[in-house]
Amino acid sequence: METSSPWPPRPSPSAGLSLEARLGVDTRLWAKVLFTALYSLIFAFGTAGNALSVHVVLKARAGRPGRLRYHVLSLALSALLLLLVSMPMELYNFVWSHYPWVFGDLGCRGYYFVRELCAYATVLSVASLSAERCLAVCQPLRARRLLTPRRTRRLLSLVWVASLGLALPMAVIMGQKHEVESADGEPEPASRVCTVLVSRATLQVFIQVNVLVSFALPLALTAFLNGITVNHLMALYSQVPSASAQVSSIPSRLELLSEEGLLGFITWRKTLSLGVQASLVRHKDASQIRSLQHSAQVLRAIVAVYVICWLPYHARRLMYCYIPDDGWTNELYDFYHYFYMVTNTLFYVSSAVTPILYNAVSSSFRKLFLESLGSLCGEQHSLVPLPQEAPESTTSTYSFRLWGSPRNPSLGEIQV
């Protein structure tokens, strides 16, 4: 947890010192300039990238149902809300002007509530997406029946409702108060800060639960599910015949996020097990291996991004909570002050890089994203729809796309 002055107040401030000295805040000008530049870059790229992602989801594929579009929309809206609401307030009242807090008690509670809401919504959305992908890869036939756009909308609605409930306590334990009193016992207006209002014991319990629910458990679940997904896909791919086998081809691009592609792959396996000539299967080659490796790397990158960006943030919160008041030396105060700004910067970076992850996951999304970007930059390029699916035939190839719905054989065609 933190205040608009990230340094805990000194036990016995001297009345002869300036207010900033009495409250323990001394941010160097170089640090203010540096973090302002970093915040500005994150804000510019994050808002532009996520806003364009929302535009791509809502406009480029309007009228076409799809589940992944809802996950992308949920993550992009969460990132936009965090960047637009929290970052400007923090830059002003946490980096440049620590005292007094200028946004009022409601602004203080709202700032922390929005930040917690977006954190919960992001990590739970990523976990739900990983769960859907795991089911789609490991049980493609069942996933085709169970995973529908309507159920995905309900799941993400539940994610946001749960995030609202989990973030509400933050609006209770945080608030505005005056840290310093004048000689006549009246609160000094210039010492108004946004800080913790509850006891240390209550704060410790809250932070423990918060770190567990908003970081450790969802991230562990995401890593576990992604690990199962990668291992299962590797096992499937290992069953592809070598170049000497008398079969023609497997799909040339196997995207990890396509259960339709996995369904086609399962169909091929069943056909092959019967000794039937698999005319839709091509030999394993280097490009297919690179495609599989790319898909696995994307899933690992999603986990790595959130570990790198969020672990220091939560470690710093635990540090603030568990170091006793008499344990804060001048050196520790100084370290925490700048560590605070570094961890919050990383926290916002996680919101800015989500469009990069979308583009890494899907070449189709990347194409639409770049076309939208080009049209907004004045280039004479319209959003070209993805190629229509080829007519059904025994010689057609499968298309593996984030948004795609390639034709798959019916259950009757794959029964053994």
From Swiss-Prot:
Q: Is Plastid given among the entry's keywords?
A: no
Spell out which residues lie on the membrane's Extracellular side. Answer: 1-32, 88-109, 177-216, 319-337
Q: Which residues cross the membrane?
A: 33-55, 65-87, 110-131, 155-176, 217-237, 298-318, 338-358
Tissues expressing the protein: Abundant in cortex and hypothalamus, and lower levels seen in the heart and intestine.
Annotated GO MF terms: G protein-coupled neurotensin receptor activity; identical protein binding; protein-containing complex binding
Key words, A-Z: Cell membrane, Disulfide bond, G-protein coupled receptor, Lipoprotein, Membrane, Palmitate, Phosphoprotein, Receptor, Transducer, Transmembrane, Transmembrane helix
Q: PTM Phosphoserine: at which residues?
A: 410
Location(s) in or outside the cell: Cell membrane
Gene Ontology cellular-component terms for this entry are: cell surface; dendritic shaft; membrane; perikaryon; plasma membrane; trans-Golgi network
Question: Any S-S bridges, and between which cysteines?
Answer: 108-194
In the bilayer, the protein is annotated as: Multi-pass membrane protein
What family does the Swiss-Prot or TrEMBL record give for this protein?
Answer: Belongs to the G-protein coupled receptor 1 family. Neurotensin receptor subfamily. NTSR2 sub-subfamily.
Question: What name appears for this protein in its UniProt entry?
Answer: Neurotensin receptor type 2
Q: What organism is recorded for this protein? A: Rattus norvegicus
